[in-house]
Curated annotation (Swiss-Prot):
Catalytic activity: Release of an N-terminal octapeptide as second stage of processing of some proteins imported into the mitochondrion
Protein name: Mitochondrial intermediate peptidase
Location of region: Disordered: 423-450
Species, as recorded: Lodderomyces elongisporus (strain ATCC 11503 / CBS 2605 / JCM 1781 / NBRC 1676 / NRRL YB-4239)
Pfam family for this entry, one: Peptidase_M3
Main location: mitochondrion
Biological role: Cleaves proteins, imported into the mitochondrion, to their mature size. While most mitochondrial precursor proteins are processed to the mature form in one step by mitochondrial processing peptidase (MPP), the sequential cleavage by MIP of an octapeptide after initial processing by MPP is a required step for a subgroup of nuclear-encoded precursor proteins destined for the matrix or the inner membrane.
Cofactor annotation: Zn(2+)
Length: 811
């Protein structure tokens, strides 16, 4: 998840439930044709993209995988990544960055010269927005390539590009002349009366950005500020890159610990893996690779708490270097905030967010934690421990202290086994499923693999449901849903040689406005990337070209519709490839979530780049994605979308009921744990960190702070590992990680108000589209919510508004 970046604000980067007895209510709207539906499914699921197995006619040729997605091999047509003619090679990317920098410098000279004229003043903010777009388009595509591309040469070129452009952006952010001209224009009432609301909004945004970048500092201090900002960016990039790395690749266990493993299959797995250990072996010691499935199986099935603890800590340990990088960028952020005159980095970050100040965030989180703990969390923990001898006699506080984080999956297995025995009535024995210790689930078709880690806590229902949700089925189903809600659909779009980073994996979709047949933007989908966690990348933002810009020259770098550059969004996931790839319900949630961001980018149509799509407040941007998870959890949606990958039969509603019930077993606990992460984020960017700077940068100890937060908040408390060094959002969402929870609360209220009655309602979809999605960043988020929910008291966006959201949501 990530939103686009303003000129000076570049960031590297559950919902309401319905009764299962409610029947699916499909509003009477025109849905996509069967031909387009089948074409979408085939594009992701079939070897040859044909309809009904026909491949001997023109229609069949149209669906050829080679013709559609692997480009023309005869050299008749080729381009660069995302149809940017420069991006044909790593060297081309560096050339593109240099061209972009030159374009930006030329534009700055032009603006500085023309601002002396009346027309130059009127065009100034639009050209500032154009300047921002030039740089952000370059740095955003570089960031995408750095994170996603398989070729290290491309990755190295992307890093070089990022450094070139980011350094220049920081120079612009402290350009006194650019700032002074902007201030004069914004303070000229006659000029303001001739500007559009969007121009005024962007002008105010950029003025804030200049001022938050130390524009009032003396030259020496500004230089220090730029250096500090760039150093934070480099450290953050390193932190994110290494966040999935383990402190050690192997963990050793003694022969006594080995004997504590009751499952003979797991023992044999340990012995086989131990034989492959590359280091010096000690007698009576076994070695387990932490990157394998063995540690997870031990935590789920082994009765020895000490052994589970060892596995859990090993999996959650970050390297010492990683923790040190975290300490340093937290300290540098505190120093940056101090230089700008803020009480803390959190105060700096929240000044123009929905929450406005850290005190409001802490109040929101504290109230949420108290409500969760006193209502659902303790109930879930009691249910989880019901089968454990003596646990029923413990007080609430004793129970909370007794259940450790490494007990969670072990207890959950016992809990769900008991639950299944009373609900499935022997269904397990009659269903062909994998054994409890396999890491992937295979159906009777040996070429079909589910893209999920499966363990013994998976129910028969959850395993069987995978067969009804192939990637193609989900994408075609989303097109059907968006057609119903917004009159927008997906159409398979052929790619040209060089347009995508992997011709075998990547698919391109045209996002089509059904009402006028116009293209709204493009999606590039890579669901089986070997190196990327599920992510949303805005590669190009929507923007109307200025009159002086050359359409033909611009068309070499972006995809156009008349005088608009169209939004380009990439969705990347790390699912296991199959033929077809079948998805767990959690992975269906993931696609829906990321598609929420994508549709925000498509529907949020503005003239100016800085306001389009997801370029809104960070604590507002997650609402569309989180709301989509309400759709993915609603049986009225899943039953309409799901169909068996071989037979085409609709998904049985009883399977959805069983699986949904089991998925929510620890819903409140998981929300509470997420609130702990948000609280840690606040603590690491608080006033106390600024005060610690008096003792020197080395006084910042993030591990001590992490363990103290865990001790204070207790539920599944971790006082042993350095997991915080593996939490990338501490950089990419520094001081605003709470936004996930705030937006979940807001999305829940929106769901209850608009969609709970009928998730396919065109009326509800249009209201949501018109009041929330279409504005991008042009309208105050609290005003959007007040209008969408018809709750006028939200419009002020103060602490009371956050309290109202909390009271009306059902987290």
């Amino acid at each position: 998840m990530r939103s686009g970046s303003r000129l000076s604000n570049y960031l590297v980067r559950l919902s309401g439930r319905v009764s299962f007895t409610q029947k699916r209510s499909l509003t009477n709207v025109k849905l996509p044709s069967n031909v387009n539906y089948e074409r979408l499914k085939a594009a992701f699921d079939s070897d040859e993209h044909t309809l009904n197995g026909k491949n001997n006619n023109n229609e069949g040729k149209l669906f050829s995988k080679t013709a559609l997605f692997q480009g023309q091999k005869d050299g008749s047509a080729s381009t660069g990544l995302f149809k940017n003619s420069y991006l044909t090679s790593p060297q081309g990317l560096v050339q593109f960055s240099k061209k972009s920098k030159l374009q930006a410098q030329t534009l700055v000279d032009e603006m500085t010269r023309d601002v002396l004229t009346h027309q130059g003043k009127l065009d100034y903010i639009k050209k500032l927005d154009q300047l921002s777009d030039i740089l952000c388009r370059t740095i955003d595509v570089a960031e995408f390539i750095r994170v996603v591309h398989d070729d290290q040469k491309w990755v190295d070129a992307a890093q070089q590009t990022h450094e070139i452009i980011f350094e220049y952006m920081n120079q612009l952010n402290t350009n006194v002349e650019l700032y002074a001209n902007l201030v004069k224009i914004l303070e000229d009432k006659d000029l303001i009366s001739q500007l559009s609301d969007e121009e005024i909004k962007v002008g105010e945004y950029l003025r804030q950005d200049f001022e938050r970048s130390g524009i009032h500092m003396d030259p020496q201090s500004r230089d220090q500020f730029v250096s500090l900002t760039q150093e934070i960016s480099i450290m953050g990039s390193h932190f994110n890159n290494e966040s999935s790395s383990l402190k050690s690749d192997w963990i050793s266990i003694t022969s006594n610990e080995f004997s504590a493993i009751e499952d003979r299959f797991i023992q044999s797995e340990v012995m086989r893996a131990s034989a492959l250990y590359p280091g010096k072996k000690e007698s009576g010691t076994y070695y387990i690779p932490l990157a394998s499935a063995i540690p997870y199986r031990i935590m789920i099935q082994c009765g020895s708490g000490n052994l589970r603890k060892k596995m859990w800590i090993g999996l959650h340990e970050a390297s010492d270097e990683q923790v040190q990088v975290l300490n340093h960028f937290v300290a540098y952020r505190a120093l940056l905030a101090k230089m700008l005159g803020y009480d803390s980095y959190a105060h700096y970050q929240l000044e123009h967010k929905m929450a406005k100040k850290p005190e409001n965030v802490l109040s929101f989180l504290t109230n949420l934690q108290e409500n969760l703990k006193n209502s659902q969390v303790l109930k879930e923990l009691r249910a989880l421990s019901a089968l454990q001898q003596g646990y029923s006699l413990l007080s609430d506080e004793e129970l909370i202290r007794q259940i450790k984080p490494w007990d969670r999956d072990f207890l959950l297995k016992s809990f769900e086994a008991k639950k299944l025995s009373s609900t499935e009535n022997g269904e397990k024995a009659s269903t062909d499923t994998s054994t409890s210790t396999t890491t992937s689930t295979t159906t009777t078709d040996s070429t079909t693999t589910t893209a999920t880690f499966s363990n013994s806590t998976d129910s028969v229902a959850i395993k069987r449901l995978c067969e009804y949700f192939s990637i193609g089925t989900v994408i075609a189903g989303l097109s059907k849903l968006f057609s119903a809600l917004y009159n927008i659909s997906f159409v398979v779009e052929p790619t040209v040689k060089g347009e995508v980073w992997n011709e075998k994996r990547v698919r391109k979709l045209n996002v089509l406005n059904n009402s006028n047949g116009e293209t709204m933007g493009y999606l590039y989908l890579d669901f089986c990337s070997p190196k990327v966690f599920p992510s949303h990348f805005t590669v190009v933002c929507l923007r109307q070209l200025n009159k002086a810009e050359s359409v033909s020259e611009h068309g070499d770098m972006v995809q156009l519709s008349k005088d608009y550059q169209l939004p380009v969004v990439a969705l990347v996931c790390n699912f296991t490839s199959g033929n077809p790839t079948l998805l767990s319900l959690d992975q269906v949630d993931t696609i829906f979530h990321e598609m929420g961001h994508a549709m925000h980018s498509m529907i949020g149509r503005t003239q100016l780049h800085n306001l389009s799509g997801t370029r809104c407040a960070t604590d507002f941007v997650e609402i569309p994605s989180v709301l989509m998870e309400s759709f993915s959890k609603d049986p009225r949606v899943l039953s309409e979308i799901g169909c068996h990958y071989r037979t085409g039969e609709p998904v049985p509603i009883n399977l959805l009921e069983q699986a949904q019930s089991q998925r929510s077993a620890l819903e409140a606990c998981e929300t509470f744990v997420q609130s702990k992460m948000a609280m840690l984020d606040q603590e690491l960017h608080s006033k106390e960190i600024v005060e610690l700077l008096r003792q020197g940068l080395e006084a910042i100890n993030s591990t001590e702070i992490y363990h103290q937060v865990e001790r204070d908040l207790e539920i599944f408390a971790d006082e042993w590992s350095t997991w915080h060094g593996k939490f990338p959002h501490l950089f990419s969402y520094g001081a605003v990680y709470y936004s996930y929870l705030l937006d979940r609360a807001i999305a829940n209220v929106l769901w209850q108000k608009l969609f709970a009655k009928d998730p396919w309602s065109r009326d509800a979809g249009i209201k949501y589209k018109e009041e929330i999605l279409k504005w991008g960043g042009t309208k105050d988020p609290w005003a959007c919510l007040a209008d969408a929910l018809q709750m006028e008291e939200l419009r002020k966006g103060d602490a009371h508004a956050m309290q109202i959201i909390g009271e009306n949501s059902k987290l």
